[in-house]
Amino acid sequence: FKVATKVTDLLDAAGIAYDVYDNIKPNPTIENVTSGVAACKAAGAEAIVAVGGGSAIDTSKAIATIMTNPEFGDVRSLEGVAPTKHPCLPIIAVSTTSGTAAEVTINYVITDAQKNRKMVCVDPKDIPVVAFVDPDMMSSMPKGLTAATGMDALTHAIEGYITAGAWELSDMFHLKAIEIISRSLRGAVDNTPEGREGMALGQYVAGMGFSNVGLGIVHSMAHPLGALYDTPHGIANAIILPTVMEYNAEATGEKYRDIAKAMGVEGTENMSQEEYRKAAVDAVKQLSKDVGIPDDLKEIVKREDIPFLAQSAY
């Protein structure tokens, strides 16, 4: 709440009335949204100030969308590309984590706890009208959360760079994001000012890219882990990313050379295709290890759940 107080103090000083809604889980649920809509109506809110990471901002997007499009009051109806007619209630996003880039993207994710699945919702009308990306607001994140959200941002950048819809403009965003994140995440985990500032920028740049082209199977497999086991999204992404990179390598042309170079690997111009592809994957594994991410799913996944997880990811 200390971080949120920085915002509420400003509202108090300006004489702006507000209510606080904080019933939000790390993997926000349908119930979090519906109770938030009720709170928003009760307050007569004209705007939402979303203070937090992806969970808070995603929940705010769903609430704000339903507020101006009441025919979508059933949260499940928002899944996919919902044909909403009106812009959502104005959202001012104040990011406190450096990973999701939810403050600049058109999508949000809500968990259907009854069905143990995550719903990806896409709506260009839900982008916040103002986004504050201030590394000082992110400086209170503990090391584990910094690492997890940072690897989430790297996953966004790498998946966005190799996705089928990638093109010149998105490539520009994603390669720069990979470079910034790779040089900044270790420092951010150690809470250095340079690391925090770099991650604030890097995750934002990645969001500007993938919001235009989409992501890949890392996310399709990570979402069921969050829905079934409440696994932190960034942890799931980080563990799965190297394996998916190996799986996708044959379809990526020379892009892994670019990824390896952006991650600081030297001599990529003299490497064979096999060498630079391995170098890119190894660089991701090393960064993940350096920031303390587990390297497998053994402590998370139950073997009997694998068929359900596979079907959910399809």
Task: Please give the residue ranges for each predicted region.
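ATP/NTP phosphate-donor binding region
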Residues: F1-A47, L297
